[in-house]
């Protein structure tokens, strides 16, 4: 079982089958941001799609069985990490897909797909709805727990916020054994999370070790002293 990583929204006005052109991506950047926030919140809550971790949703004016269904194109044997699902929509709705007004109804379609195909007792409707609601109402202020470390009577939590510009804005908080906040600091905005690998924690300081990369220069660790 893989934790969800991303949700991507596409559109098409031709049947999405093998041999046809692939569905189009949106230039509606706000919609992409919202979909990724939803995926982040679902992942924080342990949500899994099964044996894949990217969910692609194609909004189409073509007929779809029961209006929501797995794509007729089928799974890609060379890219098993994603699956496509389709939602039938009207032409007037299709014409709004590059406007801000489409975001809420598109997220309602996303919720319907999650409920229909991925809702199990562990991921009940309330959890799915709460994650989507948090992403919509909190936006760039939504905190998603990314990493946590407990040691020496301290607890360090690294949160992520996903900004409207498509960058992550991490937040570090350190608590004592009574959950009293000892340290809170914003970390630099970033496009990638390579700088945030493991957390080392003692009574006096917290250090965030970067992920090791074979393809890029490893950034320096980030160290903060606890008051």
Please state what every model-predicted region is.
Residues 167-170, 194-195:
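Short, surface-exposed coil-to-beta transition loops
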Residues 140-148, 189-200:
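Repeated scaffold domains used in trafficking and secretory/extracellular systems
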Residues 154-158, 207:
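Structural core positions within WD40/WD-like beta-propeller blades
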Residues 162-165, 213-215:
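Short glycine/acidic-enriched loop and turn motifs that connect beta-strands
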Residues 99-147:
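Long amphipathic alpha-helical scaffold segments
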Residues 1-112, 193-227:
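Acidic, small-residue rich beta-repeat scaffolds with periodic aromatic anchors
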Residues 148-154:
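Short coil-to-beta-strand transition motifs
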Residues 122-138, 170-189, 213-227:
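Surface-exposed loop/turn elements that mediate protein-protein interactions on large endomembrane-trafficking
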